[in-house]
Swiss-Prot record:
One of its GO terms (cellular component) is cytoplasm. The lineage of its organism: Bacteria, Pseudomonadati, Pseudomonadota, Alphaproteobacteria, Hyphomicrobiales. It is found in: Cytoplasm. Keywords: Aminoacyl-tRNA synthetase, ATP-binding, Cytoplasm, Ligase, Nucleotide-binding, Protein biosynthesis. A motif ('HIGH' region) lies at residues 14-24. This is Methionine--tRNA ligase. It catalyses: tRNA(Met) + L-methionine + ATP = L-methionyl-tRNA(Met) + AMP + diphosphate. Is required not only for elongation of protein synthesis but also for the initiation of all mRNA translation through initiator tRNA(fMet) aminoacylation. ATP binds at residue 305.
Length: 516
């Protein structure tokens, strides 16, 4: 039975103290593919992305540049919004944590946690990483040969002492472990789930949730000398956008709890430990799933400004094409694991899967139809076992894709679609429609019909991953725009014989590297 309930999906909100890099683009592309998939499958989707604009790091970066944190946030948030447009992301909202609606929601969640008796004031002393915006215990840090102490993410930590509000995280250890046990799909993939459970079992200490040493943040209700620790503020964005706290009868309130938060593996602790504890305290339902993807490595190396190997998504898209880049990252990298990429790898994937694969299949079969079948979808005659097997493979793809996308295994959904393209290539070559043209024209027509029908279904299924290019493929087989959703896959949407087709234009040209 198809699920038609509302579907709420989020990316992590990006920290705009610098320009967007390919890691931000990767998360947005993957989340967009999942959102589009659910929309095409008939669900009402709310897809959120945005920027996390408060905190000490923003204040320090702004000071270095001689501008206010507001100016830095506005300038760089605009860059992230430009990236979303460039990547053809279908987000329904873009949240900025400096917005009034977010201040109201953050203060509402704070008040609820206070009313639950989970906030108290004390003084804090411990190791703090400005870059990670995280506190670490001494045993999580190491003093290196350069005389600097580093946290577990390899970022410098400093000793901080100040008055702070604390959240009674220690009171939620057993409740969290019970939730993980009763909801085995709450955290994915499995290695992240194991990592979180092991962290929680090792014992949770109460969490410092306010700061007094800087003021660029959301003021604590009734105590304006404190600003909220950035993670209380940042995580609340997911609730803010639905209005479920500030506008409980509003149009988006029904979307909470989120179906899935898509995040990077480096922030799993905040999303799978602190966030559910805050929500339990505030009496709000928990998200259904938190899925952490891996890092993108440039030729096997982690990208960093110091190595000078940070890749600008704008340049990559300009060089290879948008859908080509979307396809490469979603197909090449096992979603949930780290993935390595290189320009050579992108070029190879474009040429093998797209230009020589679906592009070539569509071009060859549709050119033959235009030339030999009066430019119309041919008549489908009696089907042989090979024809039936080919159509059955295409018809069953939606089941496989739903299953894999339901587990966030985007790469496997795409692999299944491309496997059917390869199978159709073999079918087409084996049937030799060019030879049948002389010996058995009606059989040629049936082979061409079957091939074009597979192209139709593959194109419908490729829409979440390559929206524009898949749309062009559907134009080639003259599928009306109101018959491009998943409800029209299989027999429900078969090509209609006699439908006029235009001569195909190549959708995926081969990539040829520019000469140095």
């Amino acid at each position: 039975m198809r699920d038609t309930s509302p579907f709420y999906i989020t990316t992590a909100i990006s920290y705009p103290n610098g320009k967007p890099h390919i890691g931000h683009a990767y998360e947005l592309i993957a989340t967009d593919a999942m959102a589009r998939f659910q929309r095409l499958d008939g669900r009402e989707v709310f897809f959120l992305t945005g920027t996390d604009e408060h905190g000490q790091k923003m204040q320090q970066t702004a000071k270095k540049e001689g501008i206010s944190p507001q100016e830095l946030a506005a300038r760089n948030s605009a860059e992230f919004q430009n990236m979303a447009r460039l990547l053809n992301a279908s987000n329904d909202d873009f949240i900025r944590t400096t917005e009034q609606r977010h201040h109201e929601a953050s203060q509402a969640i704070w008040m609820r946690m206070g009313e639950a008796g989970d906030l108290y004031k004390d003084s804090y002393a411990g190791w703090y990483s400005v870059r990670d915006e995280a506190y670490y215990q001494e045993n999580e840090t190491e003093l290196r040969g350069d005389g600097v102490r580093y946290g577990p993410q390899g970022t410098p930590v400093e000793w901080v002492e100040e008055e702070s509000y604390f959240f009674r995280l220690s009171a939620y250890q057993d409740k969290l472990l019970k939730h993980y046990e009763e909801n085995p799909d709450f955290i994915g993939p499995a290695e992240r789930r194991n990592e979180v459970i092991s962290f929680v079992k090792s014992g949770l200490k109460d969490l410092s949730v306010s700061r007094t040493t800087f003021d660029w943040g959301i003021k604590v209700p009734n105590d304006p000398s404190h600003v909220m620790y950035v993670w209380v503020d940042a995580l609340t964005n997911y609730v803010t956008a639905t209005g479920c706290l500030t506008d409980p009868t509003g149009p988006r309130a029904k979307f909470w709890p989120a179906n899935i938060h898509v995040i990077g593996k480096d922030i799993i602790r905040f999303h799978a430990v602190y966030w559910p504890a805050f929500l339990m305290s505030a009496g709000l339902p928990l998200p259904k799933r938190v899925f952490a993807h891996g890092f993108l490595l440039n030729k096997g190396e982690k990208m960093s400004k110091s190595l000078g190997n940070v890749v600008d998504p704008f340049n990559l898209v300009e060089h290879f094409g948008l859908d080509q880049i979307r396809y490469f990252f979603l197909r090449e990298v096992s979603f949930g694991q780290d993935g390595s990429y290189s320009e050579e790898g992108i070029a190879t994937r474009i040429n093998s899967d797209l230009a020589n694969g679906i592009g070539n299949l569509a071009s060859r079969s549709l050119s033959m139809i235009v030339k030999n079948c009066d430019g119309q979808v041919p008549l489908c005659g009696p089907l042989t076992d090979e024809d039936k097997a080919m159509l059955a493979a295409a018809d069953s793809l939606i089941g496989t894709a739903r299953e894999e996308m339901g587990k966030q295994l985007i790469h496997r959904a795409l692999a299944a679609i491309i496997a059917v393209v390869s199978e159709t290539d073999r079918y087409f070559a084996g049937q030799e429609p060019w030879a049948l043209k002389k010996t058995d024209p009606s059989r040629m027509a049936t082979v061409l019909y079957v091939t074009a029908e597979v192209v139709r279904q593959v194109a419908i299924l490729l829409q979440p991953f390559m929206p524009e290019s898949a749309g062009k493929l559907l134009d080639l087989v003259a599928v009306p725009t109101d018959r491009r959703d998943f409800a029209h896959l299989g027999e429900a949407g078969r090509l209609v014989s006699g439908t006029p087709l235009e001569a195909p234009k190549p959708v995926f040209p081969r990539y040829v590297a520019p000469e140095a």
